Amino acid sequence: MATLRQVFSISELRQKIFFTFSLLALCRIGVFIPVPGINGDRAVAYFNQLLGSSQNLFQLADIFSGGAFAQMTVIALGVVPYISASIIVQLLVVFMPTLQREMRESPDQGKRKLGRMTRLFTLVLACVQSLLFAKFALRMNLVVPGIVLPAMLSLKLFGVPWVFYLTTVVVMITGTLLLMWVGEQISDKGIGNGISLIITLGILASFPSVLGSIFNKLNLGSQDPSEFGIVSLLILCAVFVFVLMATVLIIEGMRKIPVQHARRIIGRREVVGGGSYLPLKVNYAGVIPVIFASSLLMFPATIGQFLSSESSWLKRIATMLSPGSVAYSIFYVLLIIFFTYFWTATQFRPEQIASEMKKNGAFIPGIRQGKPTQTYLEYTMNRVTLLGAVFLAVVAILPSILGRILRVDANVSYFLGGTAMLIVVGVILDTMKQIDAFLLVRRYDGVLKKDRPKGRP
């Protein structure tokens, strides 16, 4: 409580938190605004019938969008195009030496260029996905007439309802760009990572429906092991606690590398070198691999699902990449491991750490300074990252498997374990760290101001 009072007693931090919550509230408003020409109630009824209790791609997309996907609202695409664009840009940096050189020579200018590239790719991907979404809506309208209002279908060009296509594409692109802008504003002027907070908000919005699914399915008096009874509920709660604890362990765990400091002469005094440690995080990438892997699998599977009626091989791809399938689980695990290594390789700088240690007279016992220290850090980080990546993949995939065994609804297994819980817990921990860091800086700033002699600026 003391920390909470301290948080809200600082005007700047209070403004940042208020700014963040205000923009997140703006995102939630978009969930209830349907695309012009779409009957949201009929769309939700169709999706509920389509999804049922089985694990389905659309179920995952709906959870990530906070219910906007099933209602066919203006932000139905969510931030998936932005995340996919970020993956493409990060891969381009790895495979294009010119971008790498620009990032080294002028980091600020390089970041601005990558930001522009990410926005451009986001626009292109949002355009493609919104076109597919419009096509899928028309296909749904054939099954359940009235999902698309007749007025939107009256104007046609070469048999194509161009007004509906144009309206859907423009509105959904605008919704995606709005979410992208909100995410960037939160990251720059608020607290936490904006895009991650938007995803977390969407996941948390499904919590009431998850509780409803559990209570509707729960049969306390049943002795049939195939039904969801008290034993299944206890197992589900145990899985939830395990995922919660494992997520915290993965994100907070670290390998401490002992570091010694050489004796130094400061003025006329000889300062005796002391000992400290260099923390290497078990999972340096946090929940970024989970978000990237989920979004990357969702993109081709969405295309396959939207166009499955027109091609048998696309239908097979959509079925193969449906959440809960063996192929989906294998690809998901491999992508999590890949993105864990990929993100660590792009963010962890062993050569810079080794250089700073040599400059400050610090060394790892038994390891020479310079290149040997860099090699040792790379080797150690690779081993630690392997452990973290495998652990992260197991935690992400295990609850979905147990969910199928316990015969619970897909939204329950998604929320109480695996992907959703990893993202929610990881983002909350990251946001809390940012708040703690802000409080620490203000505390030191306050001490410096207090100890500053009068008359000095």
From Swiss-Prot:
Effect of substituting M245I: In strain: L2/434/Bu
GO molecular function: protein transmembrane transporter activity; signal sequence binding
Compartments, record wording: Cell inner membrane
GO CC annotations on file: cell envelope Sec protein transport complex; plasma membrane
Keyword Chaperone belongs to the record: no
InterPro entries: SecY, SecY/SEC61-alpha, SecY_CS, SecY_dom_sf
Keywords: Cell inner membrane, Cell membrane, Membrane, Protein transport, Translocation, Transmembrane, Transmembrane helix, Transport
GO terms under biological process: protein transport by the Sec complex; SRP-dependent cotranslational protein targeting to membrane, translocation
Disulfide bridges in this chain: none
Pfam families: SecY
Role summary: The central subunit of the protein translocation channel SecYEG. Consists of two halves formed by TMs 1-5 and 6-10. These two domains form a lateral gate at the front which open onto the bilayer between TMs 2 and 7, and are clamped together by SecE at the back. The channel is closed by both a pore ring composed of hydrophobic SecY resides and a short helix (helix 2A) on the extracellular side of the membrane which forms a plug. The plug probably moves laterally to allow the channel to open. The ring and the pore may move independently.
Matches recorded under PANTHER family: SECY/SEC61-ALPHA FAMILY MEMBER
Protein name: Protein translocase subunit SecY
